[in-house]
Amino acid sequence: MPELSQEAGRAKALVPFGAAEVTGPSMVPTLEHGDRLLVRYGARVRPGDVIVLRHPFQQDLLVVKRAVELRDGGWWVLADNPYAGGDSTDYGTVPEDLVLGRVRLRYRPLGGQRTPFALVRWVFSAARPVRCDRSASRRLRAR
């Protein structure tokens, strides 16, 4: 499961945005290991959104998943990578008070690009908004 190695530990009312880093493969192809995230804390969550939440059993651990649907008791969240696990199929619905915010932007750090073509490719793909994907939500719900 992608856990977040950093959290901007600020109060929601003071700073509504924070940065985080993805570790793990569960959100591939949407997010990859090493991606940096811009998170909007306290934002309204809709089905299909990529969200940051506290793990239901280890609340000091932050994870990033896709919100599939709101059920009784909280959000049903799933990983985009069905082989990685670590989502609601393992721990059930996630209470709404454990959902911290929505991922608004994904940016990739400048890696070891060795050719001019690789550098140009990085420039055009380094920062992208993470949009709500309702089709992914329906597709994941069918799993």
Model-based region annotation:
Residues 1-143:
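Extended hydrophobic leader/signal-anchor segments used for secretion and membrane insertion
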